[in-house]
């Protein structure tokens, strides 16, 4: 068996003298006497042992001499000396040996520089005073000569440690210091962890300072991370994740910069499509520093052992190619935590650095394993959250370099490290696929109402970009029209920035739970919420005005415009504000509508074009309110039959046209059962900062809603609904509505509740026990889909998951598609009980994870008020050869409404037809992630995603967007090669299976450039 790297046991000891036989016999005889042996005889002295261990430290200037650590046990003396000679007997060096600790038996230790360029033999003589008391011969092998790249950067929390703007000012000051430091330390590289640091600097410093930073980035003297901020990727929609590097890309385009790397710090895991998105945004390298707080499987073994836990743990660091579903990949370094400069003593001095780095390199299980044959590693980060740079780190780093040739520490950018690794080891590195765990996303459910609004706002932002593609046809072709177009484009860019900032991982103050009424807690949450409030207000106006511009350019007379932002034609219900008693007419046919008590109307919209609109006439109609069907627990409409549980009001039975029961009998009474869980403080739920509590099982109290009343209403021309009043402790008001449709292949569920705020630990779930035994569970994630367990890396989160628009459970040919428009979070099999699963086998039960306050920091301590959570269920089998895109179509329809304009009246006909589309894409297996006017005004940019699972060519034709030329682009609108436009005026894009493709379409009279 080979010894660990750099450590070899010494050869057997040869004592100086042999004790006489007579003395040995006497001692043995004396020890055999019962009385004397027990009470008078001293214990035998332990043998003296000598160990010699090379360290990773090599001396300047040439790195030929290695610092060898000599340890001695069994020596009864206050101090000693070790003389080291080579195989020729020449003295190599002498080490003074001092007690290694205060504990008994701690032994002695000392260090000596030894020439060690190859495996060599040495002799160590142990001396006390002038007497040699022991000798050992050893064979030492040189450890690896390590190169450690130090990614000097400080973590960005937009808040948490202080008010948000103060935190950003800290990072601006750090960049000030980085620029000022270059004159005296030209080889030192500071890095901006994320693009937000750089953007904030340029926007708030003088133009000269901004130019200096841009030049330093251009010259490679300051690192530039491409990720906008440290995002919660699981709560992002498709287009939002596609924009994770968009602010960096836009800044780079405008300033003639490039980038290769991205960082994500603190957030412990990301969705499996992130490498595809980064690769499609020009990023080749990714460095992450996960914080395993409330991500128990990501704890390293040493930390888990310290707090008395057993199980499978995560080894750090990790170095691998992370590959997305489409084959796009990034070279990924995954560190344990961040702030490595403090961890390794850069703030203390070179001696502490040498000791801590040596211990890490010699004892880390990853480094001593055969699976890490490399001699290079990354030190991730400088200090902790929002810290001002400590210049001692730089001084001690440089002093260390003067003393030690190895480990060679290079203060470099992330790409400096990765380029070295790729050049030397790129083809040998392992490839991994799958997500790394969406652990921290559950904290967003501490503000469930805002999370629901955030999901809606992301889709609305995408819709406003689509509507802007008609600007050239609805605005005057003059300076005023151009100015209005630019103003709206600027506002949309700010909307996207606000939406990205709301999806950033900092939700509030460090003391948000311990001091829920504290100044920092209140002020930081108000600031955070303004990102959402501002974006939502601007979106409401942009949507209304965009719809009206198109509507007012269409047919004469009173009308409304209905817009479908999804990639496929839609027939669905829509809510018509102020529409009671009014009817929409398309091609002479009146759409079915039911007048609702709030003055709106529920309308059945039919055949609205993909990425397009219908301009409809509006006229007065015959009143058509819901028809009261009396008390009832049962409804049958279209192909669905629903029966409510008389105790809970949940859906006890759901059958479709085949008569098969879709509800599993057992622990839960039915679908849409509201489950309120309280308790769990100081337990394995990890609800406080003391990790010692993690071994304690939570004591949970589980309550379910109770039925108060149920009535049936007929919606003439549309369907039937059950309106259910329910009671639940902690919820003063609770109403559920289950709607079945005459012609639509799904049922809709809406739960409207009023919640009482409490600081007690709590969670709200909505149970959906589907009648499966061992289903496959596919989940739509941003820009892709994943299969639970199959597409998850070791240590990934199995206790909860995030979906973008749908979850598909299927077994054999049977299947159910579930969507939760208002919450991305769900669990499988059970509610959260602090199990921290390493594996999961789905059993068919799904729980919307609507609310919780389990976090002990950052997220909200309590929530109350009005809250609505909606769900859509459709029966969708998984027959071989079926339409792989159908879950995407139905899931999108569940989450994004058909957009309808305010009423308008046109004096005459406008230039637009009664219906139109932004673009013509016949391929039904393509999702248009986004289509928008280009940031620089040069044409339009379209981003496509394959949802059919096959690589192919996809044709894109003109409609509202007209073009003569096209170029490939990446997701951040950087131009690539030209694409030919065919005689049919269509352009063809190569779309990888499960992948993205983007193009710039140039509109006349612009030329490709």
PLM features: residue spans?
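An acidic-aromatic substrate-binding cleft motif
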Residues: 133-171, 177-182, 188-189, 228, ...
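Catalytic grooves of carbohydrate-active enzymes
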Residues: 324-552, 565, 749, 814-903
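Alpha-helical scaffolding within the catalytic cores
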Residues: 134-136, 174-177, 204-217, 243-246, ...
């Amino acid at each position: 068996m080979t010894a660990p790297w750099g450590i070899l046991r010494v050869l057997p000891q040869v004592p100086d003298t042999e004790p006489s036989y007579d003395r040995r016999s006497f001692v043995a005889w004396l020890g055999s006497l019962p009385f004397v042996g027990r009470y008078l005889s001293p214990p035998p002295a332990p043998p003296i042992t000598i160990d010699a261990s090379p360290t990773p430290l090599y001396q300047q200037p040439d790195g030929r001499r290695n610092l060898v650590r000599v340890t001695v046990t069994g020596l009864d003396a206050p101090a000693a000396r070790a003389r080291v000679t080579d195989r020729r007997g020449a003295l190599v060096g002498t080490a003074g040996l001092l007690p290694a600790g205060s504990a008994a038996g701690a032994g002695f230790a000392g260090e000596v520089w030894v020439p060690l360029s190859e495996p060599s033999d040495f002799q160590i003589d142990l001396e006390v005073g002038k007497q040699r008391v022991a000798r050992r011969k050893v064979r030492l092998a040189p450890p690896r000569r390590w190169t450690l790249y130090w990614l000097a950067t400080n973590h960005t929390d937009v808040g948490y440690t202080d008010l948000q703007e103060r935190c950003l000012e800290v990072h601006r000051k750090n960049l000030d210091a980085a620029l000022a430091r270059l004159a005296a330390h030209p080889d030192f590289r500071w890095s901006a962890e994320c693009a937000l640091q750089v953007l904030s600097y340029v926007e708030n410093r003088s133009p000269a300072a901004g130019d200096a930073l841009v030049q330093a980035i251009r010259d490679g003297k300051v690192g530039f991370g491409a990720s906008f901020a440290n995002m919660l990727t699981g709560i992002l929609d498709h287009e939002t994740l596609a924009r994770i590097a968009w602010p960096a890309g836009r800044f780079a385009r405008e300033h003639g910069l490039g980038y290769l790397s991205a960082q994500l710090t603190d957030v412990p895991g990301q969705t499996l499509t992130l490498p595809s998105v980064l690769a499609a945004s020009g990023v080749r390298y990714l460095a992450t520093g996960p914080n395993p707080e409330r991500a128990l499987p990501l704890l390293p073994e040493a930390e888990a052992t310290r707090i008395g836990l057993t199980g499978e743990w995560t080894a750090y660091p990790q170095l691998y190619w992370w590959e997305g579903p489409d084959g796009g990949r990034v070279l990924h370094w995954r560190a344990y935590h961040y702030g490595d400069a403090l961890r390794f003593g850069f703030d203390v001095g070179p001696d502490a650095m040498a000791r801590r780095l040596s211990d890490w390199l010699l004892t880390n299980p990853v480094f001593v394993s055969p699976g890490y044959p490399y001699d290079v590693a990354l030190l991730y980060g400088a200090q902790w959250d929002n810290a001002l740079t400590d210049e001692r780190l730089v001084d001690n780093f440089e002093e260390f370099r003067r003393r030690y040739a190895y480990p060679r520490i290079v203060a470099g950018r992330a790409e400096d490290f990765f380029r070295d690794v790729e050049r030397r080891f790129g083809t040998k590195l392992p490839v991994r696929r799958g997500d790394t765990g969406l652990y921290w996303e559950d904290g967003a459910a501490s503000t469930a109402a805002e999370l629901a609004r955030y999901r809606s706002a992301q889709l609305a932002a995408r819709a406003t970009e689509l509507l802007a593609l008609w600007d050239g046809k609805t605005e005057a072709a003059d300076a005023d029209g151009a100015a209005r177009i630019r103003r709206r484009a600027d506002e949309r860019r700010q909307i996207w920035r606000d939406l990205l900032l709301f999806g950033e991982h900092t939700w509030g103050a460090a003391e948000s739970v311990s001091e829920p009424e504290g100044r920092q807690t209140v002020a930081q949450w108000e600031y955070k919420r303004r990102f959402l409030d501002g974006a939502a207000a601007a979106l409401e106006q942009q949507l209304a005005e965009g719809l009206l511009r198109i509507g007012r350019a269409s047919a004469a007379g009173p009308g409304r415009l209905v817009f479908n932002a999804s990639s496929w034609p839609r027939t669905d219900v829509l809510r018509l504000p102020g529409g009671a008693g009014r009817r929409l007419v398309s091609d002479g046919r009146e759409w079915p509508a039911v007048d609702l008590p709030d003055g709106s109307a529920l309308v059945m919209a039919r055949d609205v074009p993909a990425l397009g609109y219908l301009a409809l006439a509006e006229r007065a109609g015959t009143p058509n309110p819901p028809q009261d069907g009396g008390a009832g627990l049962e409804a049958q409409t279209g192909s669905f039959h629903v029966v409510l549980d008389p105790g809970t009001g949940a859906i006890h039975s759901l059958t479709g046209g085949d008569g098969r029961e879709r509800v599993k009998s057992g622990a839960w009474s039915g679908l849409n059962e509201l489950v309120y869980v309280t308790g769990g403080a100081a337990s394995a739920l990890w609800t406080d900062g003391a990790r010692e509590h993690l071994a304690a099982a939570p004591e949970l109290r589980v309550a379910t809603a109770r039925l108060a009343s149920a009535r049936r209403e007929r919606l003439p021309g549309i369907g039937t609904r059950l309106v259910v009043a329910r009671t639940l402790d902690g919820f003063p008001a609770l109403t559920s509505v289950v709607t079945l449709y005459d012609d639509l292949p799904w049922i809709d569920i809406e739960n409207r509740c009023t919640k009482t705020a409490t600081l007690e630990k709590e969670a709200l779930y909505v149970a959906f026990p589907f009648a499966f035994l061992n289903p496959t569970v596919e989940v739509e994630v941003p820009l892709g889909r994943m299969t639970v367990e199959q597409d998850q890396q070791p240590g990934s989160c199995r206790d909860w998951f995030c979906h973008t628009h749908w979850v598909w459970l299927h077994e054999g040919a049977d299947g159910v598609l579930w969507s939760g428009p208002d919450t991305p979070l769900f669990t499988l099999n059970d509610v959260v009980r602090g199990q921290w699963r390493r594996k999961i086998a789905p059993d068919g039960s799904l729980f919307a994870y609507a609310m919780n306050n389990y976090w002990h920091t950052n997220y909200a301590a309590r929530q109350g008020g009005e809250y609505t959570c909606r769900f859509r269920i459709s029966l969708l089998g998984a027959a071989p050869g079926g339409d792989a895109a159908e879950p995407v179509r139905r899931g999108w329809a569940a989450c994004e409404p058909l957009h309808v304009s305010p009423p308008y009246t046109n004096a005459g006909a406008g230039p637009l037809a009664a219906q139109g589309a932004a673009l013509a894409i016949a391929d039904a297996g393509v999702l248009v992630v986004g289509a928008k006017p280009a940031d620089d005004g040069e044409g339009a940019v379209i981003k496509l995603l394959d949802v059919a699972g096959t690589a192919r060519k996809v044709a894109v034709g003109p409609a509202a967007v007209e073009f003569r030329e096209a170029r490939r682009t990446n997701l951040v609108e950087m131009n690539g090669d030209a694409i030919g436009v065919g005689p049919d005026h269509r352009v063809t894009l190569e779309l990888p299976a499960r992948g993205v493709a983007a193009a710039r379409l140039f509109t006349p009279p612009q030329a490709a450039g």
